[in-house]
Amino acid sequence: LPDATDQKEISHFRNPVYRDKMMVFPDLTRFTAKYNSLLSDSSVLGYYFHLYIDRRFFKDFIPEIVDFYDETGQITDIKEKISTVYIRNFQTYIPFEKYLTEEYYYGDYTKMNTYLVKRYLIPLNLNPQIINPGINEVQYGNVQQILDSLHEYLSVTEDAVNDLKVFPLNKLLASLEQYTIEFLSNPL
């Protein structure tokens, strides 16, 4: 649900102070300050888990696999100043305008979807009738639409994962599994 909106700054509880950064990740304390009393609801806990994984992904994982450079060749984290991206695993420099495209970053997501669903046995037939326990930042009424979109994302074959251009698959899997273990051992 947090990704099914154009208002990701709101749905991901991002701190507006960091709006100019390339990596803007969820501020979990903003979420728990508002919804701590609802965390016993499985959909709210799932929302929190999503934010936790996003935070770890953007704060810890992405900086290990790519570097962002300005036009003078200096590393920068200011989005407006980035001109070049270095993809470490593939030892490739690309123009920043190509990075967030289907050819690279977003394309890797597409190529991984079917593989990840099968690897982690992610159920696809979920009940869309989820009652909103009091969350204001996402639309619980959009669940069926999200599930329909999920099926569209699975149109690529499982072996498409062998053609990633940004993400080192084994490192990504190890990181996601580690983040999940850490979350489960201490969710709050």
Language-model features: where?
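N-terminal leader/auxiliary helical segments
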Residues: L1-L188
